[in-house]
Each structure stands twice: as C-alpha cells, then as structure tokens.
C-alpha cells in the first residue's frame, strides 16, 4: 500500500511540471526559461501586431531578411536575444544598423504613426521577442524559411 501511495505521489508531481524553452537573454550569455503561458501570450501578440508582415517568420517587404536565428544573428547589432530584439521593437534600424527605420517599421518610437504599438508594454515586447526566438526550436527550418515550406508540391 505504501509503495502504491509513493507511486501516485511521484506521478502527481511529474504530471504537474511544466516544460519551458531556453532563450538567450542578452549578448553576455544570459539564458531565460520561457514558460508555455508566456509563449501563448507572445504568439497572440505577434499574430495581432506583427504577422501581417512577418507571418511564418518571413519579412514580406524584404524576403532576404527573415526572423530566423541566422538572419537575426547576422544583423548589426545582432538581434538573436531577447534584449536586442526588444530594443529593435522600440527603435528599429536597418539591417546594418546604420539608420533608423522607425518611420517605416512599426515600433514604440513610431507609435504615433503605427497606433497598434501604443498598447504594448515592456512585458508585451518581451513576450513577442520570446515567441520569435523560440519558433526555430519549435518549427525548425519552417520558421523564416519562406514559401517553399508552405506550398503544396505536385507530383
């Protein structure tokens, strides 16, 4: 009887553990565990604020630059961590980092032009960034891979 109770206790404890995905927090090697609730929130916010131009991790206005980790890491400065991606959502720059593009890319800096950005808090920006950075772990090459992964191939 005692062994059976221990078995149920172990089952109960493990059944209620939640999984998390690791994401780079900054350029210093900091790592954060992103909980499922945060990912859901980030996905919802991404879909309502970003997906009209970035569906599936692509960039409709420039297909050469996606939201995949390779593209983000090759930007100047690199945008492959939470802090850097949130900074971009506040003050976007060109891929080489030389000019502000706040007048043409939705951002907190241009919320007067892009009203959807007005209601986003700092926590919201981090949730969106977490969604973007975890998608390569969830969708692999489909995230940012473009239409070759989403079109039906005929035989």
Swiss-Prot record:
Transmembrane segments: none
GO terms assigned for molecular function: electron transfer activity; heme binding; iron ion binding
Cofactor dependence: heme c
Function (record text): One of the extrinsic, lumenal subunits of photosystem II (PSII). PSII is a light-driven water plastoquinone oxidoreductase, using light energy to abstract electrons from H(2)O, generating a proton gradient subsequently used for ATP formation. The extrinsic proteins stabilize the structure of photosystem II oxygen-evolving complex (OEC), the ion environment of oxygen evolution and protect the OEC against heat-induced inactivation. Unlike the T.vulcanus ortholog, it does not bind by itself to PSII, but requires all extrinsic members of the OEC.
Coiled-coil intervals: none
Compartments where located: Plastid, Chloroplast thylakoid membrane
Family: Belongs to the cytochrome c family. PsbV subfamily.
Protein name: Photosystem II extrinsic protein V
BP terms from Gene Ontology: photosynthesis, light reaction; respiratory electron transport chain
Covalent S-S links between cysteines: none
Domain of life: Eukaryota
High-level lineage: Eukaryota, Rhodophyta, Bangiophyceae, Cyanidiales, Cyanidiaceae
Binding site for heme c: 50, 53-54, 105
Cofactor stoichiometry and binding remark: Binds 1 heme c group covalently per subunit.
GO CC aspect terms: chloroplast thylakoid membrane; photosystem II
Summary of subunit composition and partner proteins: PSII is composed of 1 copy each of membrane proteins PsbA, PsbB, PsbC, PsbD, PsbE, PsbF, PsbH, PsbI, PsbJ, PsbK, PsbL, PsbM, PsbT, PsbY, PsbZ, Psb30/Ycf12, at least 3 peripheral proteins of the oxygen-evolving complex and a large number of cofactors. It forms dimeric complexes. The extrinsic subunits in red algae are PsbO (OEC33), PsbQ', cytochrome c-550 and PsbU.
Signal peptide (UniProt feature, chain positions): 1-20
InterPro entries listed in its UniProt record: Cyt_c-like_dom (IPR009056), Cyt_c-like_dom_sf (IPR036909), Cytochrom_C550 (IPR029490), PsbV_cyt_c550 (IPR017851), PsbV_cyt_c550-like (IPR016003)
Topology of the protein relative to the lipid bilayer: Peripheral membrane protein
Gene name as annotated: psbV
Keyword annotations from UniProtKB, A to Z: Chloroplast, Electron transport, Heme, Iron, Membrane, Metal-binding, Photosynthesis, Photosystem II, Plastid, Signal, Thylakoid, Transport
């Amino acid at each position: 009887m005692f062994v059976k109770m221990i078995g149920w206790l172990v089952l109960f404890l493990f059944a209620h553990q939640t999984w998390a995905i690791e994401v780079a927090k900054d350029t210093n090697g900091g790592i954060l565990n992103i909980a499922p609730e945060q990912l859901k929130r980030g996905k919802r916010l991404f879909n309502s604020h970003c997906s009209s131009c970035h569906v599936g991790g692509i960039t409709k206005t420039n297909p050469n630059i996606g939201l995949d980790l390779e593209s983000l890491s090759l930007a100047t400065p690199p945008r492959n961590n939470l802090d850097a991606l949130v900074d971009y959502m506040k003050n976007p720059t060109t891929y080489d980092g030389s000019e502000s593009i706040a007048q043409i890319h939705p951002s907190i800096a241009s919320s007067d032009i892009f009203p959807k950005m007005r209601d986003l808090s700092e926590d919201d920006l981090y949730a969106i960034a977490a969604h973007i950075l975890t998608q390569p772990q969830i969708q692999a090459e489909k995230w940012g891979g473009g239409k070759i992964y989403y079109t039906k191939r005929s035989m």
